Curated annotation (Swiss-Prot):
The gene is gatB. The keyword Nucleotide-binding applies. It comes from Pseudothermotoga lettingae (strain ATCC BAA-301 / DSM 14385 / NBRC 107922 / TMO) (Thermotoga lettingae). This is Aspartyl/glutamyl-tRNA(Asn/Gln) amidotransferase subunit B. GO terms for biological process: glutaminyl-tRNAGln biosynthesis via transamidation; translation. It catalyses: L-glutamyl-tRNA(Gln) + L-glutamine + ATP + H2O = L-glutaminyl-tRNA(Gln) + L-glutamate + ADP + phosphate + H(+); L-aspartyl-tRNA(Asn) + L-glutamine + ATP + H2O = L-asparaginyl-tRNA(Asn) + L-glutamate + ADP + phosphate + 2 H(+). Belongs to the GatB/GatE family. GatB subfamily. Keywords: ATP-binding, Ligase, Nucleotide-binding, Protein biosynthesis. Its EC number is 6.3.5.-. The keyword NADP does not apply. It is an enzyme of class 6 (ligase). It comes from the Bacteria. Heterotrimer of A, B and C subunits. NCBIfam families: gatB, PRK05477.1-2, PRK05477.1-4. Transmembrane segments: none annotated.
Length: 478
């Protein structure tokens, strides 16, 4: 039996505007006490009228341009009607009939191959509140609390076509999207804070039986890893059902972190269930072509453009350029270092290994040092004052404390010995102590030189400059 996985994504992006979508309440509500950033508009009190946040429109256009969408001069808001405890109005203001943008795409790199993922639509809407479930899980909660602070926070929803064919591709797509959002500075993209939320629709096509399963929606995937894990689980669950000739329910399921399984939440709603109709209190949004062009001119260099430039200007492999460019802070750090130290590949290697390792161990996406720290480390190696081994040894302390490398090296007495007169005496002693190895070298077994270097390093407790030691040995032995 042969199966094909079909995945489409619905991604909600929380915009970093100062105020909410349709009122003047602050939009950055993550750390606020419950129900302290609300007003009659965002809680749907009778007689309260919404006004459109123009920055929200500009941010949506920026995202649409970055995703190669067609932007419509005319768009309109609608009401999506449903009942849920975190939706005090009983409806959500969204764009259903006339979204601000459609027909875009984003290219992703999968195992060295470029794959184009089409984007069906991009529309603006307001967020709902947040339910806090007290108990074991959403299905076992004894009771739930409602925080209305998030009501009315501006969102952009991005809906892809079902072009993704694996859980891995879904993860890669969301990772790259977050990178673009951060470059544009329109969203923090912090999944753990709910600023980027991904729902997936997955179905499986049985190629031997020419049968496609019902579509299942998967929610509660609040990290890149969980996107991949949840979809892997759901993919296997549906395949097993098809193998056993069992029905696959059309439903919404949630990823349970504790059990590492998806659990049924509710039946899958149809669009007709929401009874969409035009929002009567908000006029249509008219975006002149001139405004779109002005926003387009203001766009920064995006990841794909930066990758191309890094490859052509600095001559580093595309893989390196991609790793560096996916994080704007890392890309800027790299360029600042290369401007000072003309070693683009060496600096790229250092960032991708030593620095990313430290960031991972600290579970941080932030760089805690300046380019000056890394440049000083490279200059010390260039001068022969420290070896690569010592540089790697002190770097974790540099990264975690912010101290300059030279200061740490001085404190620990790690400065490399490059004095040829001093090293010559040590080399002579090593050669005198190992006459058999000297004879082997003279008989043509030049590989033994590594043994001599090792003995000198042992004598100096790793402080000798190995290049200088190597040169002295060859001079003495001829």
């Amino acid at each position: 039996m042969s199966f094909k996985t079909i995945v489409g994504l619905e991604i909600h992006v929380q915009l970093m505007t100062k105020t909410k979508a349709f009122c003047s309440c602050r939009a950055d509500v993550f750390d606020l006490p419950p129900n302290t950033a609300i007003c009659p508009v965002c809680t749907g009190q009778p007689g309260a009228l919404p006004t459109v946040n123009s920055t929200m429109i500009d941010y949506a256009i920026k995202i649409a341009l970055a995703l190669n969408c067609n932007i419509h001069e005319y768009s309109r808001f609608d009401r999506k009607n449903y009942f849920y405890p975190d939706l005090p109005k009983g409806y959500q203001i969204t764009q259903y009939f006339y979204p601000i943008a459609t027909s875009g795409y984003m290219d992703i790199d999968v195992d060295g191959q470029t794959k184009r993922i089409r984007i069906r639509r991009l529309h603006i809407e307001e967020d709902a509140g947040k339910l806090i479930h007290e108990g074991d899980s959403i299905t076992q909660a004894q009771y739930s609390l409602v925080d209305m602070n998030r009501c009315g926070v501006p969102l952009v929803e991005i809906v892809t076509e079902p072009d993704l064919s694996s859980p891995k591709e879904a993860r890669i797509f969301v990772e790259k999207l977050r990178s673009i959002l951060r470059y544009l500075e329109v969203s923090s993209g912090d999944m753990e804070k709910g600023a980027l939320r991904c729902d997936a629709n997955i179905s499986i096509y049985d190629e031997s039986a020419h049968l496609q399963s019902n579509r299942v929606e998967v929610k509660n995937m609040n990290s890149f890893r969980f996107i991949e894990k949840a979809l892997e689980y759901e993919q296997q669950r549906i395949i097993e059902a098809l193998k056993n000739n069992e029905d696959v329910e059309k439903e919404t399921r949630g990823w349970d972190i504790a059990t590492k399984m998806t659990v049924s939440m509710r039946g899958k709603e149809e669009e007709s269930d929401y009874r969409y109709f035009p929002e009567p209190d908000i006029p249509p949004v008219i975006v002149p072509v001139e405004r779109i062009e002005e926003i387009k001119r203001s766009l920064v260099e995006l990841p794909d453009e930066k990758i191309e430039r890094f490859v052509s200007v600095y001559g580093i492999p595309k893989y390196d350029a991609t790793v560096l460019a996916m994080n704007k802070e890392i890309a800027d750090f790299y360029e600042a270092c290369v401007r000072e130290i003309d070693k683009p590949k060496e600096i790229s290697n250092w960032i991708m290994t030593e620095m990313l390792r430290e960031m991972k161990s600290l579970e941080s996406e932030n760089i805690t040092i300046t380019p000056a720290h890394l440049c000083e480390l490279f200059r010390l190696m260039e001068k022969g004052e420290i070896s690569m081994k010592i540089a790697k040894e002190v770097f974790p302390t540099v990264f975690r404390t912010g101290k300059m490398p030279g200061e740490i090296i001085k404190e620990r007495g790690l400065k490399q010995i490059s004095d040829e007169n001093l090293l010559e005496n040590i080399v002579k002693k090593v050669l005198e102590d190992n006459p058999k190895a000297v004879e082997q070298y003279k008989s043509g077994k030049t590989g033994v030189i590594g043994f001599f270097v090792g003995q000198v390093m042992k004598e100096t407790k790793g402080a000798a400059n190995p290049q200088v030691v190597n040169k002295i040995i060859k001079q003495i032995l001829g």
